[in-house]
């Protein structure tokens, strides 16, 4: 058991978890966000989104001053008070967005895989795909260490594409709505472990951790967290963990921010 008073870190996915997948509303989670903020519990956003997108959302949600994990763990945006850490303000894992884009363009030209990346279109098109404003959609294109795409080929070709990426030291990851290509060494789990270790080094005590997510790309994060909330999501693959002990893992009945609130209610209000 744990409480909101003890050293605690909360890691949360965004789309489909803290944010509604369609409206991006987060108000059902607002009371818990306020309570965590008042208790000085860091809520660390962890998403496939770019750092630019997440900094905007972090401010909107009132969660400034703590680190965040962007681009599925390929980018760690450091906390404001961590200016002495090498790499400040961001730590980039693996190869850059530009290098990944070159690899993808070569595979598309030479092996004729069919996909559309966010680099292939303008912000108006991304706004149509996502329901974001054009200014917010423009932030989705500011990748530093990954590429986001829509797959437009067969499942068989996807398997071939994934194998080719793996040969080249890259991974192909499914998010709530889009696919993401990033360095094979990067991941939400790696980024979370680094942040946990940093907090432990600064405080002298390992914090208890709680994570929330709804998609397959959240599984690595939830595997390394002490307690996990799997928010009911839209993805047909769902989230499957190696350790689904009910004492550690709670699957919500509700979706999005209502599921987020349900998960917090389960692990805190019941204790």
From Swiss-Prot:
Mg(2+) binds at residues 13, 15, 214. The keyword Phosphoprotein does not apply. The active site is at 13 (nucleophile). One of its GO terms (molecular function) is magnesium ion binding. It is found in: Cytoplasm. Keywords: Cytoplasm, Hydrolase, Magnesium, Metal-binding. Its main location: cytoplasm. GO terms for biological process: mannosylglycerate biosynthetic process. Its cofactor is Mg(2+). GO terms for cellular component: cytosol. It holds the Pfam family Hydrolase_3. InterPro entries: HAD-like_sf, HAD-SF-IIB-MPGP, HAD-SF_hydro_IIB, HAD_sf, MPG_Pase. Coiled coil: none annotated. Belongs to the HAD-like hydrolase superfamily. MPGP family. This is Mannosyl-3-phosphoglycerate phosphatase. It comes from Shigella boydii serotype 18 (strain CDC 3083-94 / BS512).
């Amino acid at each position: 058991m744990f409480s909101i008073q003890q050293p605690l870190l909360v890691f949360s996915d965004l789309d489909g978890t803290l944010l509604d997948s369609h409206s991006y509303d987060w108000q059902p989670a607002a009371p818990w966000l306020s309570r965590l903020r008042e208790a000085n519990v860091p809520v660390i956003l962890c998403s496939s989104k770019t750092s630019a997108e997440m900094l905007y959302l972090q401010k909107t949600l009132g969660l400034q001053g703590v680190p965040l994990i962007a681009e599925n763990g390929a980018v760690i945006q450091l906390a404001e008070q961590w200016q002495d850490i090498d790499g400040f303000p961001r730590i980039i894992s693996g190869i850059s967005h530009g290098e990944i884009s070159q690899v993808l363009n070569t595979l598309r030209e030479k092996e004729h895989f069919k996909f559309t990346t966010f680099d292939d279109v303008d912000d108006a098109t991304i706004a149509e795909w996502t329901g974001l404003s054009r200014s917010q959609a423009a932030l989705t294109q500011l990748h530093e260490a990954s590429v986001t795409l829509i797959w437009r080929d067969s499942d068989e070709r996807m398997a071939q594409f994934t194998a080719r990426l793996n040969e080249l030291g890259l991974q192909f990851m499914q998010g709530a709505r889009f696919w993401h290509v990033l360095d094979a060494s990067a991941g939400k789990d790696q980024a979370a472990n680094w942040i946990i270790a940093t907090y432990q080094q600064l405080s002298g005590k390992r914090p208890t951790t709680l994570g929330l997510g709804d998609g397959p790309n959240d599984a690595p994060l939830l595997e390394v967290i002490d307690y996990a909330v799997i928010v009911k999501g839209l993805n047909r693959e769902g989230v499957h963990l190696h350790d689904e002990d009910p004492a550690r893992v709670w699957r919500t009945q509700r979706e999005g921010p209502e599921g987020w609130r349900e998960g917090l209610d389960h692990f805190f209000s019941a204790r």
